[in-house]
Amino acid sequence: MPTSIKAIKESLEAVTSLLDPLFQELATDTRSGVQKALKSRQKAIQADLAEEERLEAMLSYEKALYKEGYQAIAGIDEVGRGPLAGPVVAACVILPQHCKIKGLNDSKKIPKAKHETIYQAVKEKALAIGIGIIDNQLIDEVNIYEATKLAMLEAIKQLEGQLTQPDYLLIDAMTLDIAISQQSILKGDANSLSIAAASIVAKVTRDQMMANYDRIFPGYGFAKNAGYGTKEHLQELKAYGITPIHRKSFEPVKSMCCDSTNP
C-alpha cells in the first residue's frame, strides 16, 4: 500500500466501490490528510451511486418499451411556451438503448454552467436528433398550445432521412396527431431520460437563438432573460416598445400593441 498522502490520493481515485479493502486499510491511518482524502473519495463514490440510481429510474419507461419490442424510442419536449418574445422550440431525440448520460435531467434542474457540456454529450451519443422551431408570428396566429404541437411535429419530421427512425414516442405532457405509437408523460422531462435529452437540446438551441436576437435587438436582455417577462424586460418594453420577435398575443405586449394603434 502507498504511504505518501499524494500516492494514497492517486490510489483512491482508482477505487469505485465502497467495499474496496483500501478503505478499511486507510481507516487506521491517523494522518488528517489521509482521512480527508478517504472521506472525500467515499463521498464521491456515494454521489456516483446515487446518480446511477437516478438515471436507472429515469429509464423505467424506456426499459418497459424495449421489453415490448420497441427499438427506437424518441423523447420529445419543448422550451419557450411562456416567454413574451422569441420562438417555441421542440426537440426529438433517440438515445441508444440503456444509454445513461451523467447529469442529464429536466433542463430546468441542470445548472446553466453545465448546459453546454450535457448538450454536447447528448449530441455525441444520440442516434438521431430533430429540432422544430415555430416563430412568434405563427404563435400569434394559432396560439401557443397549437404552436407547441407544430414544433414537436416538425422535430419528428426532421428525423426523416436519418438512419434511425422512431417506432415509439415519449412526449412531455402532450399528445400528437401522428401515426406513431406514443405516450404522454406528465413532467416527462424529470421522469424519462429520452425526454430529458430532448429538453436540454431544445433549451440550448433556444438559448443560442435568443443570444443572437440579443445582438440584433440590444437593450432587452434577451441573452439573459431568454424572452421571459422579467422585471428588466418589462421595463425595457415600456421604454423602447416591442420588437419584431415579441408575441403580440401575449400580455402585456398585446395591450401595448392596442395602445399604439389608438390615438
From Swiss-Prot:
Keywords: Cytoplasm, Endonuclease, Hydrolase, Manganese, Metal-binding, Nuclease
Domain of life where this protein originates: Bacteria
Residue span, RNase H type-2 domain: 71-262
Principal EC category: hydrolase
Entry GO terms, CC: cytoplasm; ribonuclease H2 complex
Primary localisation category: cytoplasm
UniProt: a divalent metal cation binding residues: 77-78, 172
Cofactor binding note from Swiss-Prot or TrEMBL: Manganese or magnesium. Binds 1 divalent metal ion per monomer in the absence of substrate. May bind a second metal ion after substrate binding.
Localization terms from the record: Cytoplasm
Keyword Manganese among UniProt keywords: yes
Cofactor dependency: Mn(2+); Mg(2+)
EC code: 3.1.26.4
Pfam family for this entry, one: RNase_HII
S-S bridge residues: none
Biological-process GO terms, alphabetical: DNA replication, removal of RNA primer; mismatch repair
GO MF annotation list: manganese ion binding; RNA binding; RNA-DNA hybrid ribonuclease activity
Its job: Endonuclease that specifically degrades the RNA of RNA-DNA hybrids.
Family the UniProt entry places it in: Belongs to the RNase HII family.
HAMAP family: RNase_HII_B (MF_00052_B)
Name under which the protein is recorded: Ribonuclease HII
Organism this protein belongs to: Streptococcus pyogenes serotype M3 (strain ATCC BAA-595 / MGAS315)
